[in-house]
């Protein structure tokens, strides 16, 4: 699992190497969920942080990975729940 640094502390990422605040690698994504997070991070870098279109793409990417019977599927559900309720900035306002 990836880690992020905060004031010298190493804090684990939410999931994999790319899922969670401050978790933008390094390292390859560990699976398809982590790939969705990497794509989301790259989208924010390109379109700006909190771009609605990036959050919508993340939700689409995670949609078929949600499965409450598996740990991995529950992670996808948790990330989806967060971003479906988060405020974002419409792309036309950037």
Language-model region placement:
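Extended terminal accessory/targeting regions
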Residues: 1-94
């Amino acid at each position: 699992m990836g880690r992020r640094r905060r004031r010298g502390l190493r804090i684990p990422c939410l999931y994999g190497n790319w899922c969670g605040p401050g978790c933008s690698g390094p390292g390859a994504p560990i699976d398809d969920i982590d790939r969705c997070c990497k794509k989301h991070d790259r989208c924010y870098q390109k379109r700006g942080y909190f771009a609605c279109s990036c959050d919508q793409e993340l939700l689409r990417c995670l949609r078929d990975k949600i499965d409450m019977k598996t740990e991995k599927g529950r992670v996808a559900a948790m990330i989806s729940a967060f971003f479906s309720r988060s405020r974002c900035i419409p792309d036309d306002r950037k």
